[in-house]
Amino acid sequence: MAALAMAALLPGPATAASTVTQVAAGLDSPRGIGFVDGRMVVAEAGHGGPNCFFVPNGPPFPFCIGDTSQVSWVNTTTGGHEPIVKHLFSISLGPEGTLGASGLSVRDGKIYVLMGSTPQEAPPDSAIAQEEAGRLISINPSTKSWMSVAKVGETDFNFTLPFTQPTQGVYSPGTQEHDANPYGVLAVPGGFYTADAGSNTLDWVGNDGKIKILHHFDWRDLDPNNFPSDDVPTCVAIANGSWWVGNLSGHLYRLDMNGHVTQVVPRNDSGPLLHHVTGCTTDSKGNLYLVNMFGPGIPFTPPFFVGSVVKYQTGSGQASVLAGNLFTPNMPAIGPDGNLYVTAGSICDAAGTSPAPPGAPNPCAGGGKVLKISLPRA
């Protein structure tokens, strides 16, 4: 099961590129973020649950399923938060983190959320996994109820089955894991674009729930031991008449109206600025904002765990770092005040349980968070 591998490091202060302030804390693995009529909503992936199982020929630790995921209102003035819907599917993958409510997008007063994972990779007797894993769901905030829109994870997993799977530790072009993990969603008139981090696909989901695979990202790292060794698309945004897809590999792709795919490398004088992207959004001026959950360097050793937020001007090609030294930031959204809001501490549970070794500083103190990054008004 493809997951965004996670670990811990105490972050330093944000860079001086923009003012960064904490809006809320005490969230449970916060991921997607958006606004409904000016009110903030956040998807919380949760912390799994008590129903554990071992994957055959898998890692030496159990995966644990529960109903601890939820979608919550967040008060940007007081920092308070309360669930709109709760008891959603969540699966803890041990040291690899948690999957649950992931990408979030708002359209016409409804909240649309992608649930991570897929039912094929869960025990068949897990009712909540079979009914909710990998689903695109629609939430009515007025009634605090939800309904399923489409079986994105199930469809994407089935798409991967005809592929030969990569050989572990060997460069394997043309291969694809049999996997799915729907992650990013963008609601538009008529339907939804979804990015699947497991199947490496960009999908179109119609309002009727019908799913079409628009593109399969088949890049493979020449060094199969790098993290990640495939693209792992995590987000999709629209700017200047093109679709932009961010990837955990650090790749950014532009897809035009004719279906042409071009890799774009935002950079400044220091070099390329994208490392491990988990979220992206745009503003009304065509600027693209991308969240690096992790930084450069050797995977899972400092300073790898320090993320950043990058601004890319899709018209001019100029790029800059808005904020750095952020602990596992995840997804962004432009707020009604014109500033950028980002979930952070996305591997942290609400209680702030430390993932660090005993005696080390706790980077999750205060639990998952929402940060505000000031944007210029010009």
Question: Where in this protein do the model-derived segments appear?
Answer:
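Beta-rich, blade/repeat-based domains predominating
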Residues: 26-38, 68, 90-110, 157-192, ...
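Short loop/turn segments that connect beta-strands within beta-propeller blades
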Residues: 75-79, 139-144, 205-210, 255-260, ...
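Loop/turn residues immediately N-terminal
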Residues: 199-201, 249-251, 295, 347
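A short loop-to-beta-strand structural motif that recurs across blades of beta-propeller domains
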Residues: 59-63, 67-73, 132-137, 201-204, ...
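Short, conserved, GDST-rich strand-edge loop motifs in beta-rich repeat architectures
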Residues: 43-68, 113-135, 182-183, 232-234, ...
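A gly/proline- and charged-residue-enriched helix-loop-helix capping module
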Residues: 99, 107, 114-169
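Secretory targeting and sorting signals
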Residues: 1-16
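Beta-propeller fold detector
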Residues: 21-24, 80-88, 144-161, 212-219, ...
